[in-house]
Amino acid sequence: MVRYDPEKYAAVADNFVYVHRALRRDLSRIIEGGAELFERDFPRFARILAKHTELEDSLFFPALEERAPGSTTMTTAPHQEIESLAAALVAEDSGGDPSERLRALQELLVAHLREEEELVMPAMMEHFEAAEIWALDGRIMEFCPPEFMQEMLPWWFTHIDAEDRVAVAQNMAVGVPSEVLPVLCQWISAGLDEAEWGALVARVPALTSGAV
């Protein structure tokens, strides 16, 4: 079992572990839910996937390429193929069964996310100090308008398990400006039921600043 520096792992985990898990779980749920669920929820999934790809292509990967040229080259073609397939599924208006193309997307996405976790994430930890990764992470809001965050945060916390929620919330509690945290907490709580939110706040008391 590979052991990583815990500070560096915490810094990269939001983007390369916890978002990846949510993407896998939500796509599986949509596939299993049939046509009605696809029509309702896949457009949101596609928007969040597109923003995740944009953040990697515009923020994290260029920084890594400066330190380790060629280390993200393997992501270019999969990003393009996955985004093209997702966009085509959103644009589809024939009313046909999307299940075959959804499973093709799932196969591509799962393989690609695994590749990033096995190759890109370790490279980030090798070539950056934890503080440098946190600094990159702190720039995410430059790429994400408030309306996107209001949609993404409830989605994210819905599709990760209780332990992952705690890890992400702890990162937010120490990394997000104090004046911003209450708003993020309100958006997160909107995606959880009362018991789930209460359990999370009990583990991460700083979230009470955003309780409603």
Q: Where do the PLM segments sit?
A:
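Small-residue-biased structural context
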Residues: 1-212
